Swiss-Prot record:
The protein, known as: Gem-associated protein 2
Pfam families assigned: SIP1 (PF04938)
GO CC annotation terms, alphabetical: cytosol; Gemini of Cajal bodies; nucleus; SMN complex; SMN-Sm protein complex; spliceosomal complex
Sorted UniProt keywords: Cytoplasm, mRNA processing, mRNA splicing, Nucleus
Recorded family membership: Belongs to the gemin-2 family.
Gene3D superfamilies (UniProt xref): 1.20.5.220, 1.20.58.1070
The keyword rRNA-binding is assigned to this record: no
Subunit structure: Forms a stable heteromeric complex with survival of motor neuron protein (SMN), GEMIN3 and GEMIN4. The SMN complex is associated with the spliceosomal snRNAs U1 and U5 in the cytoplasm of oocytes.
Length: 259
């Protein structure tokens, strides 16, 4: 293979020291030759498999949401209002992120590492939902007062402002996957809303897949709700609306009447 810098042998001073900065073009090119000769012909990358994400391939389902039962679908006007409010929340969060990031966390708040899925689910949802609900409720009756370890930490601005995009996407994945096998709860809803507000556009493929998965799951839960007065209907409609309207996944959005 021809050399990139075919430098012929040149006369260099006897006191030439390759460890000091070159003083002439000849010394510089000679320095490059010496460094190139020291490079191995084959380099093997040392990869830590723990740092690789479990899913190397992102599969995006093209299936849509289940249609809303009669009387459950929100109006187009309501959806537009929710999108406008959500947009304002995102702008405010972006504007004040630096301020909230600088605020100290309470002494009882320890944010898990990005890769610690189980700790994040406990952190967001609390032990009441993560583990044995009945046992946790009995424990609460013996120890009155708010115990965030049991009920979960709310998505305070001082917390979510510290989360990188990688952490936001990972925690969203943890909670959406948890939601796939369980019902909707207010604790889950608060965190999902906060994480969606933290997602930066344009969406990464992983985030794009996750929000579509979220909307479809919300439509599944909504389709099984017996009464439209159920407290879950409004937040389920909200997430379908945000995914479909704000994040422009139009095929998942409720049509809604104009009123």
């Amino acid at each position: 293979m021809p050399r990139l810098l075919p430098v012929e042998a040149c006369d260099l001073p006897e006191d030439y020291d390759p460890s000091v900065p070159p003083r002439t073009p000849q010394e510089y090119l000679r320095r490059v030759q010496i460094e190139a000769a020291r490079c191995p012909d084959v380099v093997i990358a040392q990869i830590d498999p723990k740092k690789l994400r479990k899913k190397q391939t992102v599969s995006i389902s093209l299936s849509g949401c289940q249609p809303a039962p009669d009387g459950y679908s929100p109006s187009l006007r309501w959806q537009q209002q929710q999108v406008a409010q959500f947009s304002a929340v995102r702008q405010s969060l972006h504007k004040h992120r630096g301020h909230w990031r600088s605020q100290p966390l309470d002494s009882n708040v320890t944010m898990p590492s990005t890769e610690d899925e189980e700790s994040w689910k406990k952190f967001c949802l609390g032990e009441r939902l993560y583990s044995d609900l009945a046992a946790a409720l009995n424990s609460e009756s013996q120890h009155p007062g708010i115990d965030y370890i049991k009920v979960g930490f709310p998505p305070l601005l001082s917390i979510v402002s510290r989360m990188s995009q990688a952490t936001v996407t990972s925690v969203l994945e943890y909670l959406v996957n948890w939601f796939e096998e369980r019902n909707f709860t207010p604790e889950l809803g608060r965190w999902l809303y906060a994480l969606l507000a933290c997602l930066e556009k344009p969406l990464l493929p992983e985030a794009h897949s996750l929000i579509r998965q979220l909307a479809r799951r919300c439509s599944q839960i909504r389709a099984g709700v017996e009464h439209k007065e159920d407290d879950r209907v409004s937040p389920l409609n909200l997430f379908i609306c945000l995914v479909g309207r704000y994040f422009e996944q139009r095929d998942l959005a409720d049509c809604g009447d104009p009123s």
